Amino acid sequence: MIRQERSREMAEFSFQIEEHLLVLSENDKGWTKELNRVSFNGAPAKYDIRTWSPDHTKMGKGITLTNEEFQVMLNAFKN
């Protein structure tokens, strides 16, 4: 029963790449590690670093950052 509930939740997952910012690397199979602004499930877009398939229909594990978190990271790199 728990598995079925999780499956329904996953079926409702959606994403929209709002802005492509940077390709960090590309592997031998064409997957790219990118920095983008991505909206997940209709929420406001966040900064997102993760791997993407060549056609951007599949994604790997990644990390999302709010505007504030992204600014903290940028400031840390400047110092």
Predicted segments, located by residue:
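Positively charged, low-complexity terminal tracts
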Residues: 2-79
